[in-house]
Amino acid sequence: MPQIRNDWTIEEVQNLLQMPLNDLVFEAQTVHRQHFNPNEVQVSTLLSIKTGACPEDCKYCPQSAHYHTGLDRERLMAVESVLAEAQAAKEKGASRFCMGAAWRNPKDRDMPYVIEMIKGVKALGLESCMTLGMLSNEQAKMLQQAGLDYYNHNLDTSPEFYGDIITTRTYQDRLNTLNNVRDAGMKVCAGGIVGMGESVTDRASLLVQLANLPKHPESVPINMLVKVEGTPFAKLEDLDNFEFVRTVAVARILMPASHVRLSAGREDMNDEMQALCFLAGANSIFYGEKLLTTANPEADADLRLFERLGIKPEQRDGYDDEVHTAVIEDAIKEQQNPVRYYDAS
């Protein structure tokens, strides 16, 4: 089994990205099989606990207060409401509950509510994860002490291209948050976005940043830009699908023991594209972020694709994604009142 590395160079990664596609996907699948069951995919859902009105100016994001995208702004959900959602999921057999807030960073006044959410979710016996923006060292410790398992904070793009995307926080701010999360003892979820007009070198540089962290992120979301009217990136040209697949494959090769997640943009990928990404080493999806607010035919598409590909939800010690998936299926069939699910990656 190849040794896990933290010393990749941009030149090495560029060379991987430019390999013949068949060779690249073969290498990625070979690496993948050394660390994971190739026919299992991790499934996760996310609940938005606070939506819209974010003060950051990320040019891709419909939640930014800088742009007029028609997104409804919502205040922080009450702790009782969040725990009611968690309890309902628990009663139906859910194993994991993830919460996301559109903040630059949580304020001191927010922390007691967030901590109570974590404690309540953990008291139910559920695995917990959050994405709240930047964290100080002290805030990270508070979340860890409350029992948080995972924290998501993306690097978005390369250090060189970053200034063309965001001006309200620095690249180092993002790295500092990841360091604070890791130092506090939580697991890290960190990835990026492709299709924002970046070069191949920028994609290589992003992957190098992630792979050369002192410890690889446990989860690496690879997002395809979702172009939203009202944002500065609404009119960008589409990224070639094969370039996205190459990014997934190289992420798998560089971070062989991490979950590589198909995240934002997956709803716009056809079945063949998703299957090729799974072949290239993707083994995690946000499964259900839109399922409870869309019509049944769209909701059932994921279930049908898994069946056609012979893919099963991942089995993990202490958690059963088969049960987690069954919760989502049950909710679809019952046609419950809409519950907002939010791709906070």
Curated annotation (Swiss-Prot):
SUPFAM superfamilies: Radical SAM enzymes (SSF102114). Belongs to the radical SAM superfamily. Biotin synthase family. HAMAP family: BioB. Residues 39-266 form the Radical SAM core domain. Its cofactor is [4Fe-4S] cluster; [2Fe-2S] cluster. [2Fe-2S] cluster binds at residues 98, 129, 189, 261. Pathway: Cofactor biosynthesis; biotin biosynthesis; biotin from 7,8-diaminononanoate: step 2/2. PANTHER family: BIOTIN SYNTHASE, BIOTIN SYNTHASE, MITOCHONDRIAL. [4Fe-4S] cluster binds at residues 54, 58, 61. Keywords: 2Fe-2S, 4Fe-4S, Biotin biosynthesis, Iron, Iron-sulfur, Metal-binding, S-adenosyl-L-methionine, Transferase. Catalyzes the conversion of dethiobiotin (DTB) to biotin by the insertion of a sulfur atom into dethiobiotin via a radical-based mechanism. This is Biotin synthase. Its EC number is 2.8.1.6. Homodimer. It comes from Idiomarina loihiensis (strain ATCC BAA-735 / DSM 15497 / L2-TR). One of its GO terms (biological process) is biotin biosynthetic process. It catalyses: (4R,5S)-dethiobiotin + (sulfur carrier)-SH + 2 reduced [2Fe-2S]-[ferredoxin] + 2 S-adenosyl-L-methionine = (sulfur carrier)-H + biotin + 2 5'-deoxyadenosine + 2 L-methionine + 2 oxidized [2Fe-2S]-[ferredoxin]. Binds 1 [4Fe-4S] cluster. The cluster is coordinated with 3 cysteines and an exchangeable S-adenosyl-L-methionine. Binds 1 [2Fe-2S] cluster. The cluster is coordinated with 3 cysteines and 1 arginine. It comes from the Bacteria. GO terms for molecular function: 2 iron, 2 sulfur cluster binding; 4 iron, 4 sulfur cluster binding; biotin synthase activity; iron ion binding.
